[in-house]
């Protein structure tokens, strides 16, 4: 469709600030755009600018049909080039390019998080991770060896993907075969005997067929932690038939195996804000921090996982303006782990003498044996057309999805206490066997959606979307009877101790209507202002498939609870400057989350909570000059409880694991044809942690700065080297902390990574 432009109530209390921000950024952006135009006018031949490898111009998800610069949402796209330059080998590392997003939460007091435990704008986003627009379930670490780009969308994503976190989603785009042949390989070695190799082979066969193979292997020790090791292997073959024609068939497979040592963290003794949990343990107030290398697990701890994903996608171009796609995917993620962690509190400390070096702390064994499966078929149609003088950019579709999860019950493991300052990991508990007390969850979803962008005039656009999800969740769980402790049940007459007894068998069905609407006005050819409003819902058990009977007061997943609802307002501006090589954005946002489930003082749950996250965010991505690239951003966010029980340790209304200030910037410069230099810095402000009645633990973590650097050298067209240095100034900081505050994960110390990249 041809056009002069590339068309394929309550006010915020900080609106005055944002207006000033927009006024400030507008003349700067206009001046930069004018400078680029002036430079073009001074030449006799005007060449089209080369798109920046640091700022992909388009989302790979067909639901987002407009360019990133014209999308009325806060969206960060982390390109493959950024991932390579930074040596980011997993999703959590790649997300360091997005301000305020990270793995800040280390789990509850009795268990720990694993994998990509991401928080974004005050909410757990670990269950809103997608691969090619399809939900990827499982608490595992996701490698980037088969990733083309990572798309981070802030604000409710229910209209885009169905039930999801109220504050954002993450979409990893897989590599696909392309219309050129070549081989890229890398070999890396680094601190703590880090070893990694990757292979990316693309081969064209005939005129319309191409195959691609990505392979990865990695073994490493954690540079800052004793005993913690990680090992993973992956293979991802793919083939496309009909490349360059109107009919294309893509076949993809992904297999990843991981053998890791889980890390339960170390005691927070000695951190700012720590105090002994009782008068009898007051010596801990002066005994100093534990060695951050200490490992409080056992030599038997393990975290094994296997991911298998098979995808078939067929695309047909009905005409030049209309394409229909059908995607079928089957995926299974199996995870089995034993993770040992300390148990906080004065009652768990044993004091054989007055010397704190002899004191011990109780340990708990966290176990998981789970299998997640998803089977989905999705059909999408995109089309650009006119109705009269109004242009349309339409994306519509239907989705059928079945997600299942089985948590296998295992027998409990008893562990001896561990010395607080001199832990001994040479323990082999054994006895980790299944007991038949399983939990099974299944959710079937049918969804239909439609999005449209209307070009009203040359400069003015309206957009909107609606999605209807019809879902049905079934859940049953059993408990081994005759046990002790929380959740224990007595054995019915005639049932042997340890036998599985069904305790929950229930179901929940319903409809979710999510929608969004926005407007965009182009102030110039390269700059716009926009507004957007979105509504997103998530039903009870929407994250973990777990349900409880209606009226059962001791569960947050009761079937009589209403869906959680998030309403987000956003106003922003986006500018493409320097001949459209650099994208500048600024946005003011507010998200109100309703129907939050709160735990009462007696341990029961009620649904009366309300949260609010509001603030602003600015970002930059692209090229300042052909040789100078950067990506970064800053956010200021205030996350509070508007109604409900305060969840912060200090009794404030602040939401935990949400830094009020966060900054990130990475910049790379091509100094000569053969030498490149890069540097980056990120800041995570102080964060409140959760509260569960723990005594003496830190109420918040302190803010910190971390700097990274890179040096690249090209030997010839077939070989180049890069040296990455992480945490350049060896900053000591708290990377994550658990809810009670008894345990934390220290940030990784200064490390080095040397990589040889080969191209053929």
Swiss-Prot record:
A motif (TonB C-terminal box) lies at residues 743-760. GO terms for cellular component: cell outer membrane. Its main location: membrane. Residues 180-760 form the TBDR beta-barrel domain. It is a multi-pass membrane protein. Residues 67-175 form the TBDR plug domain. One of its GO terms (molecular function) is signaling receptor activity. InterPro entries: Plug_dom (IPR012910), Plug_dom_sf (IPR037066), TonB-dep_rcpt-like (IPR039426), TonB-dep_rcpt_b-brl (IPR000531), TonB_box_CS (IPR010916), TonB_rcpt_b-brl_sf (IPR036942), TonB_sidphr_rcpt (IPR010105). PROSITE patterns: TONB_DEPENDENT_REC_1, TONB_DEPENDENT_REC_3. Residues 1-31 form the signal peptide. It is found in: Cell outer membrane. Involved in the active transport across the outer membrane of iron complexed with catecholate siderophores such as dihydroxybenzoylserine and dihydroxybenzoate. It derives its energy for transport by interacting with the trans-periplasmic membrane protein TonB. Can also transport catechol-substituted cephalosporins. Receptor for microcins M, H47 and E492. Belongs to the TonB-dependent receptor family. This is Catecholate siderophore receptor Fiu. It comes from Escherichia coli O6:H1 (strain CFT073 / ATCC 700928 / UPEC). The gene is fiu.
């Amino acid at each position: 469709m041809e056009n002069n432009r590339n068309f394929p109530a309550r006010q915020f209390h900080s609106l005055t600030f944002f207006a000033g921000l927009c006024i400030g950024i507008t003349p700067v952006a206009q001046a930069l755009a004018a400078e680029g135009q002036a430079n073009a006018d001074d030449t006799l031949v005007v060449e089209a600018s080369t798109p920046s490898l640091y700022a992909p111009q388009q989302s790979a998800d067909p639901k987002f049909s407009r360019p990133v610069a014209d999308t009325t949402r806060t969206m960060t796209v982390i390109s493959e080039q950024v991932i390579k330059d930074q040596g980011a080998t997993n999703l959590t590392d790649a997300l360091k390019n997005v301000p305020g997003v990270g793995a800040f939460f280390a789990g509850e007091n009795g268990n720990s998080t694993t994998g990509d435990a991401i928080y974004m704008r005050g909410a757990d986003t670990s269950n809103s991770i997608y691969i090619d627009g399809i939900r990827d379930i499982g608490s595992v670490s996701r490698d980037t060896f088969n990733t083309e780009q990572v798309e981070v969308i802030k604000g409710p994503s229910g209209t885009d993907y169905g039930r999801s976190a109220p504050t954002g989603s993450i979409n990893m785009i897989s590599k696909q075969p392309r219309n050129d042949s070549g081989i890229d390989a890398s070999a890396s070695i680094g601190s703590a005997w880090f070893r990694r190799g990757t292979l990316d082979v693309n081969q064209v066969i005939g005129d319309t067929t191409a195959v691609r193979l990505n392979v990865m292997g990695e073994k490493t020790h954690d540079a800052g932690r004793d005993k913690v090791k990680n090992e993973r292997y992956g293979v991802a073959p793919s083939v496309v038939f009909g490349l360059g024609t109107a009919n294309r068939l893509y076949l993809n497979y992904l297999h990843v195996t991981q053998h890791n040592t889980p890390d339960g963290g170390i005691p927070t003794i000695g951190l700012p804000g720590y105090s002994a949990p009782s008068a009898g343990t007051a010596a801990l107030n002066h005994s100093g921090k534990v060695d951050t290398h200490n490992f409080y697990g056992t030599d038997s701890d393990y975290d094994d996982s296997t991911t298998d994903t098979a995808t078939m996608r067929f695309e047909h171009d009905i005409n030049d303006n209309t394409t229909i796609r059908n995607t079928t995917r089957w995926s299974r993620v199996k995870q089995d782990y034993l993770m040992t962690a300390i148990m906080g509190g004065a009652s768990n400390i044993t004091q054989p003498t007055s010397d704190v070096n002899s004191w011990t702390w109780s340990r708990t064994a966290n176990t998981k044996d789970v299998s997640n499966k998803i089977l989905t078929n999705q059909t999408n149609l995109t089309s650009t057309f006119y109705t009269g003088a109004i242009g349309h950019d339409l994306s519509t579709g239907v989705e059928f999805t079945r997600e299942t999860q089985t948590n296998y019950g295992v027998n409990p493991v008893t562990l001896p206490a561990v010395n607080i300052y001199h832990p001994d990991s040479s323990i082999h508990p054994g006895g980790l066997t299944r007991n038949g007390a399983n939990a099974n969850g299944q959710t079937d979803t049918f969804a239909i959606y439609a999005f449209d962008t209307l070009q009203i005039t040359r400069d003015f656009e309206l957009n909107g979307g609606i999605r209807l999800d019809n879902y049905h969740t079934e859940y049953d769980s059993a408990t081994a009877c005759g046990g002790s402790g929380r959740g224990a049940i007595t054995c019915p007459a005639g049932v042997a101790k340890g036998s599985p007894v069904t305790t929950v068998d229930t179901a929940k069905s319903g409809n979710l209507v999510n929608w969004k609407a926005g407007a965009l006005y182009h102030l110039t050819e390269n700059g716009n202002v926009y507004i957007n409003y979105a509504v997103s819902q998530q039903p009870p058990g929407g994250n973990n498939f777990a349900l409880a009977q209606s009226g059962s007061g001791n569960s947050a997943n009761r079937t009589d609870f209403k869906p959680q609802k998030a309403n987000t307002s956003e106003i922003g501006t986006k500018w493409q400057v320097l001949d459209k090589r650099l994208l500048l954005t600024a946005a003011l946002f507010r998200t109100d989350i309703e129907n939050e489930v709160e735990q009462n003082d007696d341990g029961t749950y009620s649904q009366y909570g309300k949260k609010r996250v509001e603030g602003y965010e600015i970002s930059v991505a692209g090229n300042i000059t052909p040789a100078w690239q950067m990506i970064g951003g800053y956010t200021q966010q205030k996350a509070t409880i508007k109604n409900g029980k305060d969840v912060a340790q200090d009794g404030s209304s602040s939401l935990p694991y949400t830094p009020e200030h966060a900054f990130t910037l990475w910049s790379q410069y091509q100094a000569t044809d053969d030498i490149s230099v890069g540097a980056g810095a990120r800041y995570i402000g102080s964060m409140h942690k959760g509260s569960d009645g723990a005594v003496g633990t830190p109420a918040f973590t302190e803010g910190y700065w971390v700097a990274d650097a890179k040096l690249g050298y090209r030997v010839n067209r077939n070989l180049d080297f890069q040296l990455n240095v992480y945490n350049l100034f060896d900053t000591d900081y708290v990377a994550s902390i658990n809810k009670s505050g008894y345990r934390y994960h220290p940030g990784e110390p200064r490390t080095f990574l040397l990589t040889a990249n080969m191209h053929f």
